[in-house]
Amino acid sequence: MFDQDDAAFSRPGGEACGAAPARPIDLAHLARQTMDDRDLEREVLSLFVQQALSVRDKILDADATQRRALAHGLKGAARGVGAMAIAEWAERAEEHPQDLRLLRRLAGLIRQVRDFIAAIDR
């Protein structure tokens, strides 16, 4: 009988290694939303990146009301494609439109998602 401490049951790198970082896009969610249509996935992701970059470029110069509207639209689009971290931070930005720290974090997440989508689209 094997002991759970055997190498076959231990984590590569030991117990101290953390969980793998989550992908910026939940690809299983996206596949469900697009009924596993890969062409539709690419199209939806392309449209999402365009919208997200547009929000990123406009949100810092917008007033509080405009920031709320931009963040709200981004939140819904992000949930639709499975970009849950962007959706979460967009919701925070919607609730606190004057918090520049939130807006910068959101911009960073948008860059990560853009880069992730570019990498999977190769």
Locations of the language-model features?
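Amphipathic, coiled-coil-like alpha-helical segments
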Residues: M1-A28, D39, E43-S54, A77-W89, ...
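Conserved catalytic core of two-component sensor histidine kinases, primarily the HATPase_c ATP-binding
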Residues: A31
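Helix-loop segments that flank and shape redox-cofactor active sites
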Residues: S54-R68
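Signal-transduction coiled-coil helices of two-component systems
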Residues: I59-A62, V81, A93
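An anion-binding catalytic pocket shared by soluble metabolic enzymes
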Residues: L74
